[in-house]
Swiss-Prot record:
Gene name of the record: LMCD1
Protein name as it appears in the record: LIM and cysteine-rich domains protein 1
GO biological process terms, semicolon-separated: negative regulation of transcription by RNA polymerase II; positive regulation of calcineurin-NFAT signaling cascade; regulation of cardiac muscle hypertrophy
Function: Transcriptional cofactor that restricts GATA6 function by inhibiting DNA-binding, resulting in repression of GATA6 transcriptional activation of downstream target genes. Represses GATA6-mediated trans activation of lung- and cardiac tissue-specific promoters. Inhibits DNA-binding by GATA4 and GATA1 to the cTNC promoter. Plays a critical role in the development of cardiac hypertrophy via activation of calcineurin/nuclear factor of activated T-cells signaling pathway.
Region (Disordered): 200-235
Domain named LIM zinc-binding: residues: 241-306, 307-365
Length: 365
């Protein structure tokens, strides 16, 4: 008989449950005031009150997000973007780059300042290049503190990079063999697919940086540039750089995004560095390389293994329920209305929602 794996980290599990309890009552951003407040479901990643996802309630904090990304990047070639937590037993935290812009405002005798804080900015670049990058991002998606863009980033961190896609202790009821499969799965994608985009001017991707800052070309200086096919070109001739996605021109004085998994002969406009599956911007430039394109973590994992439509976790069990292109753990194949188990019973799947005939009829009426 299969055994359920022991808690990998009871402290972490208790903390996660406690966080959900303390998040009770958090308003839903999707319902726009109609939700009475977050009410955690016992195993679904939704609010029992409004049925919206946890993402729509933005339940995480900066510290939780930084710990999650730190865990994702540790034991990978991007671990330099993390820092060890003092007394944290090997835990690493994401060294998230924030950018603060202070602009003077002329209002009478006493000078005042307008301060803008970006919750995230591309690492390893000068403030000038970082600001250029941000100005190319739609205003509603710029991660400025206290704005819609900052909430958008937090939702995307939860959606594109679910903690339960990388941390077995955040999954419910993994059997011992499933635990081993998941650990190998995570180890493999960190080695073969995980990447972090690099922001640079066209032709400067992959160049050495001094003290973590992207070097700017001195005025009047000539350098040997690489063409889009990677060969060296005559510096006296203007090099044309093309975006890998839209095939549009990339101006030489405008930042682009590079992927070391793709090779530095390819570049993307900042708004074109998106998931190949959902076309959403890749949050914090974190991507997973597959089939010659960047993917978000969620859709990369789903492309290799089924995801349970009930609990939203990746399925590592050999035996599970599948209906068309949807999948469920056997124990989660239950009606979304009355929660009765539907294995061996009549059911209806409409727009991805699994219902028993009674609840389906009630919903239609």
């Amino acid at each position: 008989m299969a055994k359920v794996a022991k808690d990998l980290n009871p402290g972490v599990k208790k903390m996660s449950l406690g966080q959900l309890q303390s998040a009770r009552g958090v308003a839903c951003l999707g319902c726009k005031g109609t939700c009475s407040g977050f009410e955690p479901h016992s195993w679904r990643k939704i609010c029992k009150s409004c049925k919206c996802s946890q993402e729509d309630h933005c339940l995480t904090s900066d510290l939780e997000d930084d710990r999650k990304i730190g865990r994702l990047l540790m034991d990978s070639k991007y671990s330099t973007l993390t820092a060890r937590v003092k007394g944290g037993d090997g835990i690493r935290i994401y060294k998230r780059n924030r950018m603060i812009m202070t602009n003077p405002i002329a209002t009478g005798k006493d000078p005042t300042f307008d301060t803008i804080t970006y919750e995230w900015a591309p690492p390893g670049v000068t403030q000038k290049l970082g600001l250029q990058y941000m100005e190319l991002i739609p205003k509603e998606k710029q991660p400025v503190t206290g704005t819609e863009g900052a909430f958008y980033r937090r939702r995307q961190l939860m959606h594109q990079l679910p903690i339960y896609d990388q941390d077995p202790s955040r999954c419910r009821g993994l059997l011992e063999n499933e635990l081993k499969l998941m650990e190998e799965f995570v180890k493999q994608y960190k080695s073969e697919a995980l990447g972090v985009g690099e922001v640079a001017l066209p032709g400067q991707g992959g160049l050495p940086k001094e003290e973590g800052k992207q070097q700017e070309k001195p005025e009047g200086a000539e350098t040997t540039a690489a063409t889009t096919n990677g060969s060296l070109s005559d510096p006296s001739k203007e090099v044309e750089y093309v975006c890998e996605l839209c095939k549009g021109a990339a101006p030489p004085d405008s930042p682009v995004v590079y992927s070391d998994r793709a090779g530095y002969n390819k570049q993307w406009h900042p708004t074109c560095f998106v998931c190949a599956k959902c076309s959403e911007p890749l949050v914090d430039l974190i991507y997973f390389w597959k089939d010659g394109a960047p993917w978000c973590g969620r859709h990369y994992c789903e492309s290799l293994r089924p995801r349970c439509s009930g609990c939203d976790e990746i399925i590592f069990a050999e035996d599970y329920q599948r209906v068309e292109d949807l999948a469920w753990h056997r124990k989660h194949f239950v009606c979304e209305g009355c929660e009765q188990l539907l294995s061996g019973r009549a059911y209806i799947v409409t727009k991805g929602q699994l219902l028993c005939p009674t609840c389906s009829k009630s919903k239609r009426s």
